[in-house]
A protein has these predicted regions:
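Active-site microenvironment for binding and transforming phosphate-containing groups
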Residues: 1-167
Length: 167
């Protein structure tokens, strides 16, 4: 295992790569034309640091992926209706280099709900990925108690593993 990284990629056959998540977004990128794969872990902290944007830009610049032929698959994660944060998080999200307002729902109690999956999808679109090649998850880890782990929900350790390899 590689510690303290939120993204890994390979262009080599028979090497399994992946990321562990609970409520955070796991993103699996695959470009079969290269071939190459990448796994990204992005909680709200990774999102405000634009991990997906930076990773995809790097992969495109180094010709590891082609945005027109790359597919993106999202793991189950905490979704828009469940991811409540404070205004200090909103202030950080507003520093991203695109319009984030569609991904924020303000509440009267100085809290807001954010669409972490949506923010990461927008980063993929901003880098030229085709919307038809992006596959969001409909599973909300906070609500799918029988099928998903949610640290926010049960405060227990449990994780999903988003992984892949090139045959």
């Amino acid at each position: 295992s590689i510690m303290n990284v939120d993204a890994v990629y390979t262009c080599e056959k028979n090497i399994l790569i992946g990321v562990f998540t609970a409520d955070c977004v796991g993103i699996f990128l695959v470009d079969e034309t290269k071939p190459s794969i990448c796994c990204i872990h992005s909680g709200w902290k990774g999102t405000v640091q634009a991990i997906t944007d930076k990773c995809v830009k790097e992969l495109i610049q180094n010709k590891i992926i082609n945005p027109k032929t790359t597919k993106a698959f999202f793991s189950p994660s905490i979704l828009f209706d469940s991811l409540e944060v404070g205004m200090e998080v909103i202030d950080q999200i507003k520093q991203l280099n695109f319009d984030v307002e569609p991904f924020i729902r303000y509440m009267p109690n100085q809290k807001a709900f954010i669409d972490n999956q949506g923010l990461n999808i927008q980063m993929l679109l901003n880098n030229g990925l085709n919307i038809d090649n992006i596959y969001p998850s409909k599973l909300d880890t906070k609500k799918e108690l029988n099928d998903c782990f949610s640290f926010r929900n049960d405060k227990k350790t449990g994780e999903h593993f988003t992984y892949g390899y090139i045959k």
